[in-house]
Amino acid sequence: MGRSQEQGQGQGPVHSIRLSTVGATRPTETGTTHEPTGLDLAMKLHYLKAAYIYSAETARDLTVRHLKEAMFMLFDQIAWTTGRFSRRDSGRPYIKCNDCGTRFVEGQCNLTVEEWLSKPDRSVDEFLVYHHPIGPELTFSPLIYVQMTRFKCGGLGLGLSWANIIGDAFSLFYAFNLWAKAITGEKIYAPTTPSIGERRFQSPNPTVKDPVSIKRVEPVGDLWVTPNDKKLANYCFNLSVADQISPHFPAKGDDSIPVFEILAGIIWKCIAKVRVEPKPVTVTIIKKDPNDLKLNAIRNSQVISSVSVDFPVAEATVEELVKAMGEAKDERCGIEEIGESCDGNLDFVVYGAKLTFLDLTGEDLYEAKVMGKSPESVYCNVEGIGEEGLVVVYAAAKSEERVVTVTLPEEEMERVKLEFKKFGLIAP
């Protein structure tokens, strides 16, 4: 479980926890269901996390009532996300759209926003996201948790824990942005979620039938928690894009290479220097699908690709690794087929099955304005990661910077941070 769950026992910097439930105002027609795709089912042990921090000037006058009323408006648009999972006779999970609601969590913090943001390791923001996995009683388990944390100065932290089975990270950001608009008093509209037939993925590269970016794990039953033998640790930091590109990547004026691949290549090298791995080495890249026609729908449509190299990564140049990432193979079709074929009765991990890089750099996380003001800081991560680890790269408050959240086995983290220092990713 995530660090934030511990605060329920009064531990950590967030205290005075109160839980309630928020749902849609309009009842869903009896018997309505939402059917997950094979890709959805493959992601069922993963949970997405986001925490947005707003200043006292922005949020001081916002009350619990304001936030809940805006959530009513949001869930009127996407009411199926407030349902609960059940199983068919075959064992296949599906959502009963029974309007059971989302869990709303209130907490207090004795620090000001300025004091909170002064902490160099931003993984402290995990405390702003209340997480609880689905299960062991599926019919009583919310799919989304929303946490409101009031700072001493009047500032506000808004955190979401979002079951990946209902939609990818881009779906989470879309839903949060709608909520932020509703908080401000804007009218919001979300298009109807596509049918299961429209949501099923048709691969442009159907030759990839045996995806290596997904790993089967021991059966977990109805408690959807990734089984790991190793304890994982989080580390989050900001870096300057220019400082990393100039010394490590002689681009020679070529502006076509995305920043994400360059940063991922540098971080991949740092991790490879700590790990002794036989060749070939494979990593997973997860990105937004640029060709997705249903851009504003709650669904899993992210591109999940594998990158394999047959040379020592630790000794490779960043340019070689960027080139390899440009040849990534889209494996969604194979993952979709695996999820469909087992009817959700087998359990898998994608994040951390191989070392995984999640690209969120194309998302303007700071457009989530409340009362006309952007958040002071945004944090993103994933819960339920496999033992190979995850690197998330996303926008910072300053356009010339990026934020990197790293989750690795605890035994590796300090050695990897030493490599980060050698490469100038973090201060010595």
Curated annotation (Swiss-Prot):
One GO cellular component term: cytosol
Q: What is its main location?
A: cytoplasm
**How is this protein named in the record?**
Protein ECERIFERUM 26
Question: Any keyword Cell wall biogenesis/degradation?
Answer: yes
Could you list this entry's UniProt keywords, alphabetically sorted.
Answer: Cell wall biogenesis/degradation, Cytoplasm
Task: Give the gene symbol.
Answer: CER26
GO BP, sorted A to Z: cell wall organization; very long-chain fatty acid biosynthetic process; wax biosynthetic process
Cellular localization per UniProt: Cytoplasm, Cytosol
Q: Low complexity: which segments have biased composition?
A: 21-36
Q: Tissue-wise, where is it found?
A: Highly expressed in leaves.
* Gene3D superfamilies listed in its UniProt record: Chloramphenicol acetyltransferase-like domain
Q: What Pfam families does this protein's entry cite? A: Transferase
Quote the function comment for this protein: Involved in biosynthesis of the epicuticular wax. Plays a role in very-long-chain fatty acid (VLCFA) biosynthesis and is required for C30 fatty acid elongation in leaf. Despite its classification as a BAHD acyltransferase based on sequence homology, CER26 does not seem to share the catalytic mechanism of the members of the BAHD family.
Q: Which stretches does the entry tag as region Disordered?
A: 1-36
**Protein family (similarity comment):** Belongs to the plant acyltransferase family.
Q: What is the lineage of its organism?
A: Eukaryota, Viridiplantae, Streptophyta, Embryophyta, Tracheophyta
What does gene deletion cause?
No visible phenotype under normal growth conditions, but mutant plants have increased levels of C29 alkane and reduced levels of C31 alkane in the rosette leaf wax.
InterPro entries xrefs: CAT-like_dom_sf, Plant_Fungal_Acyltransferase
Asked if the keyword Cell cycle belongs to this entry, the reply reads no
